[in-house]
Amino acid sequence: MKQKHAVHLAVRRAARRLAALAAGLALSFAAQAQTDLWSESYRLEGLGRYAEAQAQIAPLATRQPAHEFALIRSAWLQYLQGSHAEAEAQYQRALALNSRSIEAALGVMLPQMAQYRWADAIKSGRKVLANSPWDYTAHVRIMICEEATSRWDELAKHAAEVSSRYPTDATLLVYWARAESALRNTRRARELYAQVIERVPGHAEATKYLKSTQ
């Protein structure tokens, strides 16, 4: 009897070890499958095959509970496909999941700008700035909207203010110079474009302006 009992114990232990091994292998295969899924999605995006890249992660983007990163990446791939309404909806879903996400809030601006919804994009950008006052990307996207709607006074003041926080940045100086040029402040625009050349020697727009206004 003792011998039989010992055999039964050994069998049960072996069964438990096999079950643990099987579970470990299942987890390993699942992790590998997910890694392959992401790798393939990035590979397809690199080839410009955005719909296929999105299809790779669709099960994660639509699952419950929500997968935040999959939602944001799916929104980005929708945007690249030109599916702007869908992209905005997915960015909003990501934002509903994590209201502190600056990335999702910035993402909302992209489809709005692509649809020339400048006022909406500015409003979205200001929501970002309410939480992160000197977020560079939000400021630049708002400047794009200000330029698109010919708000030259606003753009000049805005670019000047942000440029003081990022004094080595050429992009901000370009927007500031464009605003001053549109306001016919040629001398100031030339000074700003000259600063652009200091930061980016040979900058095409700055070089052209300086030559045309000699």
Question: What residue ranges belong to the model's regions?
Answer:
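Canonical positions in the second alpha-helix
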Residues: P59-L60, R93-A94, K127-V128, E161-V162, ...
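Structural marker of alpha-solenoid helical repeat scaffolds
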Residues: R63, L97, A130-N131, S164-Y166, ...
